[in-house]
A protein has these predicted regions:
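Conserved ABC transporter NBD signature motif
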Residues: 60-68
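ABC ATPase nucleotide-binding domains
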Residues: 74-80, 84-231
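Conserved coupling/switch loops of ABC nucleotide-binding domains, chiefly the family-specific signature
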Residues: 58-61, 111, 211, 243
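Helix-to-loop junction immediately C-terminal to a conserved catalytic motif
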Residues: 52
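ABC ATPase nucleotide-binding domain
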Residues: 5, 27, 63, 345-347
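Non-catalytic connector elements of ABC transporters
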Residues: 239, 249-370
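The feature captures the beta-strand-to-loop junction immediately N-terminal to the Walker
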Residues: 37-39
Length: 370
């Protein structure tokens, strides 16, 4: 079955000046829904094209189902490819698009007909078999593209931003349909996206990429709850970032980070030294907020500068007493609302604070999405 191994793969363009994939190694397990996630230009689509055989690596090896495929053409790799732009034949109806692969492979007509019907019933479009692509909605066209990719019998499905051209509500519905389909058919899927909500909802595991490199691989919960890299804390979910120094290292894996103007926060963790400059990250939804100024351990005073009602949540923009700005998100059902200009106390739970070495090029550069 099609597990995929990428071993020390590098790909550069412009005579080596642009390194799109930089010494990447990955192991995608059999029957796994795996996503490559990152901002535009991070190398995720290039890596997918390398796995597909559409381009060749400069260095490294790619294995599909235990077979080295560096020199194997795309049509012999046993893959199905789904593009953001659907890539349907505009002059063919839905039926001919879906059964194109079996016909090219010269399968028996009975088998091609059976597969075509099964695939279209699976994506709930058998009744539109005689429609041409321009008569279909975007969601329908993507389901046709998926059926076509599966009709040739591929067990490895490669999806390049498959939901990117669809509107928000259709994306939400189709991503669950897509995962269910992959799991029901026991496929291996590699899904490229820049949408972290899409990746976390649909994936068994995710590789977060930036500037051609894989920063962290893990399931959605691991990446959210335990980011190993500062950019992962930024790109998966949302985080507030504050600068400081380690002012004290205590026993029991505790230390103190001193923020601007000497404001202390106790943090859990290890591996940091007194005097070290660090950046801390904390999720807006992990912060606590109370009315008035009540000095408690791991709390800072602040003033509400902005309030945004977002349905299930309320988003507060707060200026802390040292001038730093943060965001606090609280469930609207708590019915504990705060107004702009109100003085508040913000609690920072020690176990919810992530600490990272301060980036050499600065925080802004390290968190940039380009």
């Amino acid at each position: 079955m099609p597990e995929v191994k990428v071993m020390n793969v590098t790909k550069a363009f412009a005579k080596g000046k642009i390194v799109a994939v930089d010494n990447v190694s990955l192991h995608i397990r059999d029957k796994e829904y795996f996503s490559l996630l990152g901002p535009s230009g991070c190398g995720k689509t290039t890596l997918l094209r390398l796995i597909a055989g559409l381009i060749q690596p400069d260095e490294g090896e790619i294995y599909i189902g235990g077979r080295l495929v560096n020199d194997v053409p795309p049509e012999d790799r046993g893959i199905g490819f789904v593009f953001q732009t659907y890539a349907l034949f505009p002059h063919m109806d839905v039926w001919d698009n879906v059964t194109y692969g079996p016909r090219v492979k010269a399968w028996e007509e009975d088998k091609s007909t059976r597969i075509g019907r099964e695939m279209l019933e699976m994506v709930r479009l058998y009744e539109r078999a005689d429609a041409v692509p321009h008569e279909l909605s975007g969601g329908m066209m993507q389901r046709v593209a998926l059926a076509r990719a599966l009709a040739a019998g591929a067990k490895l499905l490669l999806l390049d931003e498959p939901l990117g051209a669809l509107d928000a509500k259709i994306r939400l519905t189709l991503r669950y349909d897509l995962r269910k389909l992959v799991k029901d058919l026991e496929l291996t899927a590699i899904h490229v996206t820049h949408d972290q909500a899409e990746a976390t909802a649909i994936s068994d595991r995710i590789a977060v990429m930036r500037k051609g490199r894989v920063l962290q691989v893990g399931n959605p919960q691991e990446l959210y709850m335990n980011p190993k890299h500062i950019f992962v804390a930024h790109f998966i979910g949302e985080s507030n970032f504050l600068e400081g120094y380690v002012s004290e290292v205590r026993e029991k894996k505790e230390f103190v980070v001193e923020l601007r103007q000497g404001l202390p926060l106790q943090v859990l963790g290890k591996g940091h030294k007194t005097g070290e400059k660090v950046a801390i990250a904390v999720r807006p939804e992990a912060l606590e907020i109370k009315k008035g100024k009540v000095r408690k351990p791991n709390s800072l005073f602040g003033e509400v500068e902005g309030v945004q009602f977002e349905g299930t949540d309320i988003r507060y923009e707060i200026k802390l007493e040292n001038g730093d700005h943060i965001v606090v998100v609280r469930p609207s059902l708590l019915m504990e609302w705060f107004s702009a200009g109100e003085k508040v106390t913000v609690g920072f739970p020690a176990e919810k604070i992530f600490v990272f070495p301060y980036p050499l090029k600065g925080l802004r550069e390290e968190l940039a999405l380009e």
